[in-house]
Structures are given as C-alpha cells and as structure tokens.
From Swiss-Prot:
Listed name of the protein: ATP synthase F(1) complex catalytic subunit beta, mitochondrial
Additional note from the record: Binds calcium ions.
Gene: Atp5f1b
UniProt binding sites for Mg(2+) 1: T213
Organism expressing this protein natively: Rattus norvegicus (Rat)
Job description of the protein: Catalytic subunit beta, of the soluble F(1) head domain within the mitochondrial ATP synthase complex (F(1)F(0) ATP synthase or complex V) that produces ATP from ADP and phosphate inorganique in the presence of a proton gradient across the membrane which is generated by electron transport complexes of the respiratory chain. With the non-catalytic subunit alpha (ATP5F1A), forms the catalytic core in the F(1) domain.
Length: 529
C-alpha cells in the first residue's frame, strides 16, 4: 500500500515537472510570483556597493531539471526565498534564475531570465541572497540595459555604486500626494483636450506609422526642457529593429548625448526574442530605474512602456510553464494581481512623480480581451493616434474626439480650460456630422452658420498640428513647445471668431496663435507680390 502511495506521489510530482498536471502546482498557489519578499520595502536601500553584482549569498544548489525556460534547483540547505535571484555557475554569459515556487524536498522552481541552452543537470547554482538587483542613478541615462541590469549598448559597464531590487511594494498611502496636477507637455492637442495628470497613467493607442515613436521622443524632450525631468523607456517584447531605430533616432535628435552626461533618458530592453521570464520582468526593471529618480532626486519622471500587452503575454507564458490552471482566454489566473502590483508603483508621492505612457496593443481589436480590459482599469487618460488624421498631414495625429482624460474636470483644470476644450470638441463634432452633406451637396448648400462652423473647425484642426523639435531634421520646421496658457488663449480666440479673416493654411504647423497671425501676414505679402 505504501509503495503504491509512493508511486502515485512520484508520478504526480513528475507530471507537475513536465507541466502535465496543473493541479500539482495548486498547493503552492500562495507562493507564486505576485508577492514581494519580506525584505523588500518602498523605503529602498540605495546604499553604495563596491561591485556591479549584488552581494552573493552562501547557499549553493544544483540543477535537477530543465524544461524550457523553467529550471528546477535542489538545495541541500539554505532554501532561497520566493523571488530571490540565483546565478548558474560555470557559464561564460551570466544566467540569472528567479525563484517562483517551492516544490518541497528542498527543491525550488525558477524562471530563467535568458536562454537555457547548454544547461545540464547537476550544474552548480549560487543563491545571490536577494531579488534581482539592477544599477540605478544618473549613470543609467543614455545607456541601454537588459532585465538584469547588464549594459547591452557596447559602451562598457554602467559606472554606478547604487543598486536596487526590481521587486518593491507600492508607496504607502501616507507617502502619496493627493493633489491633482496637470503635467504640461507643451503639445497643444494633448494639453488642451486630454491632459496628462502628474503621476497618472496614459494609454497610447496607435497603429504602425502614425507617429507613436516621434510623439514619445517629443514627450521625453519636452519633459526634460520644461520640467528638467528624466525619462525611462522600457521596451517590453519589442522588435529589436524598432528598439535599435529608437536609440539611433534619440542620438540624432539630441535626447541621448554620447559625448557628455546630458542624456535625458535611460533605456531598458527585453526584446521579442527573449525568454518569457525576461519579458515578464523588464517592465519592473524600467520602473525601478524611474523610482530612483522619483524617490531619491525628487524628479517628475516619465516612464514609457512599449508594449504593456507584451508584459501580460509574457506573464501568461510563465504561468503556463509553472503549471497553473489558465483563466479566461488562456491568460494567467493572477492577471489582475500581476498588473495591479506593477501599476500601483506608478504614482505621485510627496517627493516626486512617475507619469507613465503605455503603448497598448489590442488583440484582434477586441477591447473586451482580458489583457487590454485589465489595463484600462488603471488608465487616467487615453491618447488615440488616428491614421485618418495622419493622412491629412496633421501631426501629431492625435484624435481630438477619441482621446480622453480623467482630469478634464473644471475643478482640476479650471473652468476656462474646460470650456475652451469642450467648445473645440463640439465644433469638431459638428464639422464631422456636416462632412456627409458636404460630400454629397458641396459647401454651397450649407447655411451661413454651418459655413462658419466648417471654416473655424478646419482652422482648429490645422492649429492642433505642431512642429516637433525632435522632427526638425525631417520637416524643416523649427520645433515649438507651447505653454498651456498660450494654447488656451489661441483656441479661445479662434472659437470667438477673432481670426475668421485669416486663411486656414496660416494655422498649419505653428506654435502659439501669434505665429499663425505672422504666417498669415507673410502669405498675404507673398500673394500680394
């Protein structure tokens, strides 16, 4: 009888190892990836350390099984806690494993942060004694690192003495700031119609080729100039080519400076070809870099995550490898917890703020898919880039009617800003509803009032365009950063009819309204001569 029980237990354990028996993982459900270890607290320890690698622990184990990105390690003594980083010994390249489950019999199940090719059973593994720690501080600006903090830009080591664990708790309630404040971006259409809240989360929706990258670079540039703030770009499941292009475009536009220490952005990449463990953690690495600037330097940091869907997708792959029972549409059962644990760390404290702009891929354009639906619950604003607007040559191609913001409230932005924004949206909506009539009957059949609406709407549409500083090399137009007061004043005067006499092309690709007036005078001179 005992031998039968032993065989059943053995079969169950081996089935769990192969991922065949998801029920075998259930007793360890409370030990999964979603909780931070006891030693990790928002009051981070940024103490100087002498070497790039975190201080090693003493426990040594050996690999007993390798199933793709999942590696089981047995320790004779000193079992490492959940989320600890382990390092495989005797390899040329550094391979870090993160503890995900305790299986019993002194064995831990880990997720590899890099490829497991060449691993063999019996190989030695050392416990680092802490979660994955990465370099933080001003030295990370202008550099590209991977999920475990190694530089991947071929420019030597990141010379910082400060390291931080990628797992941390969200700031406590007493540390949070309750003030609602606009983060002025200097981009007219964003500041007027869908303003970003300091410490808020913005969803950036846009297909290929509508200007997502240029908008991201302009935001990085403007935040550095207007607020003196830094930015962090986390490429989660990105195409390597796109990440490479972005890096070189940033060098060309001056956002990254290779000659001196004036770079404004740190880059963290976990590309599409990386194992799921790396893609599931790289967003946390980027967030940790941003948290240092917020908590230690009191900065207003901009954190870009491209693409937040890949974070969820990687979590789903990891979950399946760990043998958990899948939830709706095959996603991990801890989807909401994984997302919430990360998103709650993106917030405003009394020291500074992290404002996050997250590119969101919507699978099969289905907004009810659990991955985007879970993300929407955390968003404060949405910026929708429209191909139809890009085709008109209006950049940034932000859709003024589809983009929304939670802080578009007269109690937060003020009644003047609110009234002007709603007035602009109303006139654009009226123009949209008149377009069918214009297409069939022509402009001549409209009433005088409707003709005026169309004329003003077309001027507003063009005035929502703006030359970007990072795109000067392509457009030949000098970039403009427009203060919020100037933006409100300009649109207010167009709505009031103060510029009904100016031609609509005068409003295209200008900064404040005074430039439109000057451009109209210049056009009149050219036509007069």
């Amino acid at each position: 009888m005992l031998s039968l029980v032993g065989r059943v237990a053995s079969a169950s354990a081996s089935g769990a190892l192969r991922g065949l028996n998801p029920l075998a993982a259930l007793p360890q459900a409370h030990l999964l990836l979603r909780t931070a270890p006891a030693g990790v607290h928002p009051a981070r320890d940024y103490a100087a350390q002498s070497s790039a690698a975190p201080k090693a622990g003493t426990a040594t184990g050996q690999i007993v099984a390798v199933i793709g990105a999942v590696v089981d390690v047995q320790f004779d003594e000193g079992l490492p806690p959940i989320l600890n980083a382990l390092e495989v010994q005797g390899r040329e390249s550094r391979l870090v494993l993160e503890v995900a489950q305790h299986l019993g019999e002194s064995t831990v199940r880990t997720i590899a942060m890099d490829g497991t090719e060449g691993l063999v059973r019996g190989q030695k593994v050392l416990d680092s004694g802490a979660p994955i720690k990465i370099p933080v501080g001003p030295e990370t600006l202008g550099r590209i690192m991977n999920v475990i903090g190694e530089p991947i830009d071929e420019r030597g080591p990141i010379k910082t003495k400060q390291f931080a664990p990628i797992h941390a708790e969200a700031p406590e309630f007493i540390e949070m700031s309750v003030e609602q404040e606009i983060l002025v971006t200097g981009i007219k259409v964003v500041d007027l119609l869908a303003p970003y809240a300091k410490g808020g989360k913005i969803g950036l929706f846009g297909g290929a080729g509508v200007g997502k990258t240029v908008l991201i670079m302009e935001l990085i540039n403007n935040v550095a100039k207007a607020h003196g703030g830094y930015s962090v770009f986390a490429g989660v499941g990105e195409r390597t080519r796109e990440g490479n292009d972005l890096y070189h475009e940033m060098i060309e536009s001056g956002v990254i400076n290779l000659k001196d220490a004036t770079s404004k952005v740190a880059l963290v990449y976990g590309q599409m070809n990386e194992p799921p463990g790396a893609r599931a953690r790289v967003a946390l690495t980027g967030l940790t870099v941003a948290e240092y600037f917020r908590d230690q330097e009191g900065q207003d940091v901009l954190l870009f995550i491209d693409n937040i869907f890949r974070f969820t997708q990687a979590g789903s792959e990891v979950s399946a490898l760990l043998g958990r029972i899948p939830s709706a549409v095959g996603y991990q059962p801890t989807l909401a917890t994984d997302m919430g644990t990360m998103q709650e760390r993106i917030t405003t404290t009394k020291k500074g703020s992290i404002t996050s702009v997250q590119a969101i891929y919507v699978p099969a354009d289905d907004l009810t898919d659990p991955a985007p639906a879970t993300t929407f619950a955390h968003l404060d604003a949405t910026t929708v880039l429209s191909r139809a607007i890009a085709e008109l040559g209006i950049y940034p191609a932000v859709d003024p009617l589809d983009s929304t913001s939670r802080i578009m409230d007269p109690n937060i932005v003020g009644s003047e800003h609110y009234d002007v924004a709603r007035g602009v949206q109303k006139i654009l909506q009226d123009y949209k509803s008149l377009q069918d009539i214009i297409a069939i009957l022509g402009m001549d059949e409209l009433s005088e009032e409707d003709k005026l609406t169309v004329s003003r709407a077309r001027k507003i549409q063009r005035f929502l365009s703006q030359p970007f500083q990072v795109a000067e090399v392509f457009t030949g137009h000098m970039g403009k950063l427009v203060p919020l007061k100037e933006t409100i004043k300009g649109f207010q005067q167009i709505l009031a009819g103060d510029y009904d006499h100016l031609p609509e092309q005068a409003f295209y690709m200008v900064g404040p309204i005074e430039e439109a007036v000057a451009k109209a005078d210049k056009l009149a001179e050219e036509h007069g001569s």
